[in-house]
Structure formats: structure tokens, C-alpha cells
């Protein structure tokens, strides 16, 4: 069984799709109904529907579904339909990227910037089966914390890594290096290291630039900087960014990736951020450009 392959042209016909994973936001009300509706559309095209054990906790009966572990689901699925918002896609991206499985997001959240479809557009899932799609490959970050000679934290991020003080009453002092060469020292609440995908999230709210996905830059944006400092730095994806926190006044500093639980740093830790070896593959079936989506979701340029 082969996953849908990346396209060099704008469109290509996909091979036979046999299995589709449905990944719902299990913490959202009404998700059982959404799963059943999506499964009905997928089955109309002759494919089997995969759920993981976690999905059964929302009241779905296993009858008619293939119930797999997450790892087996990643191996078996031809593509994934994520039912939720951007947070659900971020959680799935880390799981799917090493297996190169494409993701089709169906928004049941708020802005849903990464989602391709709104829930009333479920039937457009059929375009994937008909070969009417493109794949948008999104750069990810590899984030690791080195403590002495030991890697004590490592993860991937589709949006951003955030290094931030744990108290609203303390400021942090962070030394930023690029390929081990000093760039600056940032005083403030912290720093956001973002992908182009994450440039329209927390980074944008902090005053960072909007970066189109194909640019593949790494941006470094201070959070509430103290004093006169640049609002952002842009680096090549081939660079390695290192953040060295300085600890004083009993400060606590955490690193978090894509909104996941923070990992507490200690004196002497080095946080390394670089382009990840994998990417997130987002299915597109509507043909919207990045800028039309930007205007739609963020109402930029509208009266």
C-alpha cells in the first residue's frame, strides 16, 4: 500500500485509496456525529474507515470501523481526515509527518487557518478520491534541549517553539545564536521561533511578519521586548538557531512546541531549533491561494 505521493505538478490522479483515518478532537462536543457523517462520505467511495482507540471514547461504536493503534493507523492510512481546529491538526502533524501521510483538515473550531474544509463542505472529501487535489508541504522545526551532553527534550513543531518566562512578573534574558555565532540578547517575556505556517499564529500577534509557506524561513520574534530591539529576525532554513537562557532572580523559563505542555529549563541548558527532516503534508481540494485564505481567515484588507 502506497501513500499519496507528493506532486511536482499542480494536480495528479491518486492511486486506489483503500483506508482513511478519521482523527477527531475528542474533547469537543458533538464529535461523534461529525465522525459518522465523515465516515459515510468516505465509504461512498469504497474506502474503509480507520479509528484509533482514543476515538472510541466519544461514544462511537467500533462496528464498521477498523480500530488500530496510532502507529498502525499511520502505516495503513492513505490519508487522514482531521475533524477539529488548528490545534487538532497540530497534534496530528507530529504523528503523521514521519510516515508522510497527507492530512485533510475539516474545521469544527474557530479560525481554522490550516483546515481546508468547513464541516458543511464534508462532501468535498470526494475530490481526493477523484484526484482533484494538491499537496501543500509545510516545513517543520526540530526542537531539542541539550543539558550538558544529554538531550533531555526533543520534539517537532509545525507552528512554533516558544521560550518564555514562567511568571508574568519576571522578564527573561535570552542569548540568540545562529550557527553558534551570537546574534543578539533579548530582554522581555520570551521569544517565538516560528515556521512560515506559524507566522500567522502567535508570531503574528507578537508583531512578527507574515511569511508565505514556500519561503521556508525560520523567524525569531521577541515577546514584549524590553528596550529598543528589532521586532523580528529571519533566518535561512539551513541555519541552526540556539537559545541560551540566563537565569537570575529565581526565574523559571519553559520551552513549549505547538501549544503542548511546557518543559522547564535549567541553568546551562541550550535550546536548539533547526529545520526538521520531515514536513507536514496538507491536502488542498479547493484551489484557494495562500493570500486569499489569509484575507478570509484574518480579514486583512477587508472594509
Question: Which residues does each PLM region occupy?
Answer:
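Short glycine-rich anion-binding loops that position phosphate/pyrophosphate groups of nucleotides
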Residues: 27, 86-88, 111, 197-199
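Short glycine/serine/threonine-rich phosphate/pyrophosphate-binding segments
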Residues: 31-32, 87-92, 200-205
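Catalytic core of DAGKc-family lipid kinases
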Residues: 110-189
